[in-house]
A protein has these predicted regions:
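Short, positively charged and aromatic/hydrophobic N-terminal segments
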Residues: 3, 12-15
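Active-site-facing substrate-recognition patch
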Residues: 16-84
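PRPP-dependent phosphoribosyltransferase catalytic core
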Residues: 17-31, 156-231
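Phosphate/pyrophosphate-binding loops at sites that engage ATP/ADP/AMP, CoA/4′-phosphopantetheine
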Residues: 76-88, 155-161
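Short glycine-rich phosphate-binding loop at a beta-alpha junction
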Residues: 85-94, 169
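Conserved acidic residues
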Residues: 88, 136, 166
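Short, glycine/charge-rich flexible loops or terminal/linker lids adjacent to PRPP-binding catalytic cores
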Residues: 101-139, 147-153
Length: 231
């Protein structure tokens, strides 16, 4: 049985589907089970941006677990059908969402492309790999949302190619305020399978963290840039 908790809903940072709590908790539990998400309050991780964080997420590990991979694919398909309706194309953000995006597109019977962070410096100098036609409606698939900047870079590339980006779906979001602001500024709707709140709830329930860690984890999300200055 899955215990359902109440969390704040926001159109930019979580799905509005009726079963979003159940999906969020199952997904969070799965990520913890396969160590796709690591929590270490005492020895924080350093992101590429320089931000120190008590959490590190590597959703690419899900590709090595067929049952979890299948679950994510099925939930993405449900989410896209329910939230966006008919679309012409699925786009994955390179590199983390290429595989899961292609699986989702296959299940939906839709064409697939992936979007690089920037144009190649050689060959055809493509940023979008695959066939894109102006006027196509697109849903973007991403594995992880931190500030959202790299994800929205893919959205802009598709818009520049003449596509109508209906929105984005992702496996996990940290729920940072920067992400919400960036998605609002870009007029891009985001729906995720799970989020930071679900993750912390499951981590506490399954003894991945202690009650004493909670306050620090909450403070990190409130001020991720300042949180690790004394660590």
């Amino acid at each position: 049985m899955v215990t359902v908790f109440s969390f704040k809903k926001t159109v930019y940072l979580c799905s509005m589907r009726n079963n979003f709590e159940e999906t969020g908790l199952i997904t969070a539990e799965s990520l913890l089970q396969i160590k796709a998400i690591k929590l270490d309050n005492a020895n924080p991780f350093t992101w590429a941006s320089g931000i120190k964080s008590p959490i590190y997420c590597d959703n690419r590990r899900t590709l090595s677990y067929p049952k979890i991979r299948t679950y994510l694919r099925q939930e993405f398909v449900k989410m896209i059908n329910e939230e966006f309706g008919t679309v012409d194309l699925i786009a994955g953000v390179a590199t983390g969402a290429i595989a899961i995006g292609a699986l989702v597109a296959q299940d939906l019977g839709l064409p697939f492309v992936y979007v690089r962070s920037e144009k190649k410096s050689h060959g055809l100098e493509n940023q979008i790999e695959g066939v894109v036609e102006s006027g196509q409606s697109v849903v973007v698939v991403e594995d992880l949302i931190s500030t959202g900047k790299s994800s929205l870079n893919a959205v802009q590339a598709l818009r520049d190619a003449g596509c109508n980006v209906k929105g984005m779906v992702a496996i996990f979001t940290y729920g940072l305020s920067d992400a919400e602001e960036n998605f609002k500024a870009a007029s891009c709707t985001l729906h995720t399978l799970t989020n930071y709140d679900f993750l912390i709830k499951k981590a506490l329930e399954q003894n991945h963290i202690k009650d004493s860690d909670m306050q620090s984890l909450i403070k990190w999300r409130e001020n991720p840039k300042g949180w690790g200055q004394d660590k």
